[in-house]
Amino acid sequence: MKKLRYLYTDGDHKWAVVARDPERPPFVIDTNEYLIVKGDDAILTDPGGLEIFPVVFTAVSQEFNPEQINKIFSSHQDPDIISSLGLWLEVNPDIRCHLSWLWRTFVPHFGGTRDTFVSIPDEGVRIPLGDIELEAIPAHYLHSCGNFNLWDPKAKILFSGDIGA
């Protein structure tokens, strides 16, 4: 079973990882999801595929109210990264999904409407989170075209998705 573990805490600014699941079925790719919180603002990075949604949701729910997640960051378009989007939108229909402009017509097949998606230009963008800004940094072709990393300059943590996978 996946568990949520805090990696960084500074007041109301937190980073947590939903770590690998040693009990997962061998035919399912395992991923690590990260929850970044600043005040009342929360972003979930690469929330995973449909197959692992129940264990990710359970792990997050044990430490955090998942209805407070109002942003998702998708490093790229692969189903193991973002196909659970539709299920997260059932938890909070107001979630905004930040992803490369390149995938704005592909990822909606997993759920959402035009208003769900916030396109990231090739050069990257700053994403507000509470009173700080995270930086979507281009990492094109390090795993996929339109791939992005996410940098938190306050915590000095870089989310690199599944580069090298």
How should these model regions be labeled?
Residues K3-V60, N149-S160:
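Conserved beta-strand hairpin/beta-sheet module of binuclear metal-dependent hydrolase folds
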Residues I137, S160-G161:
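Short, conserved beta-strand edge motifs with alternating hydrophobic and charged residues
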